[in-house]
């Protein structure tokens, strides 16, 4: 399988990612894609041919293999890696849409017209939601595939010998799996790396939401605090009634200073 196209997509989205997003890309490239291409495919190569049962009944090894391996590990992993990296393409497409919209705006209103976006790749507005939803989708895909693996292969185990009694086997036969320990190690490795990617995605979701909440509520708190603070140019005054009974003038007395006649206000 050619993974060059997938590598180009992930490399393009790397410049729009946060620090946690770049760590996720490194984990996907080094610990998942490379391990899959270099080692995992070789371990499961001709797996059905090496699945041997102690019977000469025609068709029995084939149905037993299908019973215990309904879907190959490597094919499930390939589908998982493709689906988990596709949301990154949405981010690249959204940025490309912004660039095209900005270009048309410049052509229509001239090169000196104010820009539609202060920073095309900055995660604001729709791009922020696209990036956030891509993280949630990637975490959901990895979680779903881990659940599928757990349902198909109990506890992600790889036994050395399995007992099969499926028709057309004449009786319960023992079937032997090729390189079970090596396959178990790779299975656990892929499960652990998928769990790490889920944790990184959820951490990035928390980071983005928390950062956005701070940007929204911090200016409001500053405005509220400024409203409750009295400026230094307006010191406190003591308000008292004047002594003239006809005009009821008001006397403003500042602490430590002479009284000021404020007059009568309608």
Curated annotation (Swiss-Prot):
<dbReference type="InterPro" id="IPR019570">
    <property type="entry name" value="Connexin_CCC"/>
</dbReference>
<feature type="topological domain" description="Cytoplasmic">
    <location>
        <begin position="206"/>
        <end position="266"/>
    </location>
</feature>
<protein>
    <recommendedName>
        <fullName>Gap junction beta-4 protein</fullName>
    </recommendedName>
</protein>
<dbReference type="GO" id="GO:0005730">
    <property type="term" value="C:nucleolus"/>
</dbReference>
<dbReference type="InterPro" id="IPR038359">
    <property type="entry name" value="Connexin_N_sf"/>
</dbReference>
<keyword id="KW-1133">Transmembrane helix</keyword>
<feature type="transmembrane region" description="Helical">
    <location>
        <begin position="21"/>
        <end position="40"/>
    </location>
</feature>
<comment type="similarity">
    <text>Belongs to the connexin family. Beta-type (group I) subfamily.</text>
</comment>
<dbReference type="Pfam" id="PF00029">
    <property type="entry name" value="Connexin"/>
</dbReference>
<dbReference type="GO" id="GO:0005243">
    <property type="term" value="F:gap junction channel activity"/>
</dbReference>
<keyword id="KW-0812">Transmembrane</keyword>
<feature type="topological domain" description="Cytoplasmic">
    <location>
        <begin position="14"/>
        <end position="20"/>
    </location>
</feature>
<dbReference type="GO" id="GO:0007267">
    <property type="term" value="P:cell-cell signaling"/>
</dbReference>
<comment type="subunit">
    <text>A hemichannel or connexon is composed of a hexamer of connexins. A functional gap junction is formed by the apposition of two hemichannels. Forms heteromeric channels with GJB2.</text>
</comment>
<keyword id="KW-0965">Cell junction</keyword>
<keyword id="KW-0303">Gap junction</keyword>
<feature type="intramembrane region">
    <location>
        <begin position="2"/>
        <end position="13"/>
    </location>
</feature>
<comment type="function">
    <text>Structural component of gap junctions. Gap junctions are dodecameric channels that connect the cytoplasm of adjoining cells. They are formed by the docking of two hexameric hemichannels, one from each cell membrane. Small molecules and ions diffuse from one cell to a neighboring cell via the central pore.</text>
</comment>
<dbReference type="InterPro" id="IPR002270">
    <property type="entry name" value="Connexin-30.3"/>
</dbReference>
<feature type="transmembrane region" description="Helical">
    <location>
        <begin position="185"/>
        <end position="205"/>
    </location>
</feature>
<feature type="disulfide bond">
    <location>
        <begin position="64"/>
        <end position="164"/>
    </location>
</feature>
<feature type="disulfide bond">
    <location>
        <begin position="53"/>
        <end position="175"/>
    </location>
</feature>
<dbReference type="InterPro" id="IPR000500">
    <property type="entry name" value="Connexin"/>
</dbReference>
<dbReference type="InterPro" id="IPR017990">
    <property type="entry name" value="Connexin_CS"/>
</dbReference>
<dbReference type="GO" id="GO:0005922">
    <property type="term" value="C:connexin complex"/>
</dbReference>
<feature type="transmembrane region" description="Helical">
    <location>
        <begin position="74"/>
        <end position="94"/>
    </location>
</feature>
<keyword id="KW-1015">Disulfide bond</keyword>
<dbReference type="GO" id="GO:1990349">
    <property type="term" value="P:gap junction-mediated intercellular transport"/>
</dbReference>
<feature type="topological domain" description="Cytoplasmic">
    <location>
        <begin position="95"/>
        <end position="130"/>
    </location>
</feature>
<keyword id="KW-0472">Membrane</keyword>
<feature type="topological domain" description="Extracellular">
    <location>
        <begin position="152"/>
        <end position="184"/>
    </location>
</feature>
<feature type="transmembrane region" description="Helical">
    <location>
        <begin position="131"/>
        <end position="151"/>
    </location>
</feature>
<feature type="disulfide bond">
    <location>
        <begin position="60"/>
        <end position="169"/>
    </location>
</feature>
<dbReference type="GO" id="GO:0005654">
    <property type="term" value="C:nucleoplasm"/>
</dbReference>
<dbReference type="InterPro" id="IPR013092">
    <property type="entry name" value="Connexin_N"/>
</dbReference>
<dbReference type="GO" id="GO:0007608">
    <property type="term" value="P:sensory perception of smell"/>
</dbReference>
<dbReference type="GO" id="GO:0042048">
    <property type="term" value="P:olfactory behavior"/>
</dbReference>
<keyword id="KW-1003">Cell membrane</keyword>
<feature type="topological domain" description="Extracellular">
    <location>
        <begin position="41"/>
        <end position="73"/>
    </location>
</feature>
<dbReference type="GO" id="GO:0005886">
    <property type="term" value="C:plasma membrane"/>
</dbReference>
């Amino acid at each position: 399988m050619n993974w060059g196209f997938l590598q180009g997509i992930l490399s393009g989205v790397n410049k729009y990612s946060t620090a946690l997003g770049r760590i996720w890309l490194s984990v996907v490239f080094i610990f998942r894609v490379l391990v899959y291409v270099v080692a995992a495919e070789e371990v499961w190569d001709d797996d059905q041919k090496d699945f041997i049962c102690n019977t000469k009944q025609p068709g029995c090894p084939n149905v037993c293999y299908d019973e215990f391996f309904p879907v190959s590990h490597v094919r499930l992993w390939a589908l998982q890696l493709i689906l988990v990296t596709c949301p990154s393409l949405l981010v690249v497409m959204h940025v490309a849409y912004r660039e095209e919209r900005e270009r048309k705006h410049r052509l229509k209103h001239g090169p000196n017209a104010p820009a539609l976006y202060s920073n095309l790749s900055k995660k604001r507005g729709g791009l922020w939601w696209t990036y956030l939803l891509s993280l949630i989708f990637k975490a959901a895909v990895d979680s779903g595939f881990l659940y599928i693996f757990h349902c198909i292969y109990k506890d992600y185990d790889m036994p050395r010998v399995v007992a099969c009694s499926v028709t057309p086997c004449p009786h319960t036969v023992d079937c032997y799996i090729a390189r079970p320990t090596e396959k178990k190690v790779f299975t656990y490795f892929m499960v652990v790396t998928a769990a790490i990617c889920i944790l990184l995605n959820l951490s990035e979701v928390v980071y983005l939401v928390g950062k956005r909440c701070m940007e929204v509520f911090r200016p409001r708190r500053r405005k509220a605090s400024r409203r409750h603070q009295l400026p230094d140019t307006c010191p406190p005054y003591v308000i008292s009634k004047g002594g003239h009974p006809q005009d009821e003038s008001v006397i403003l007395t500042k602490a430590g200073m002479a009284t000021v006649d404020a007059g009568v206000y309608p």
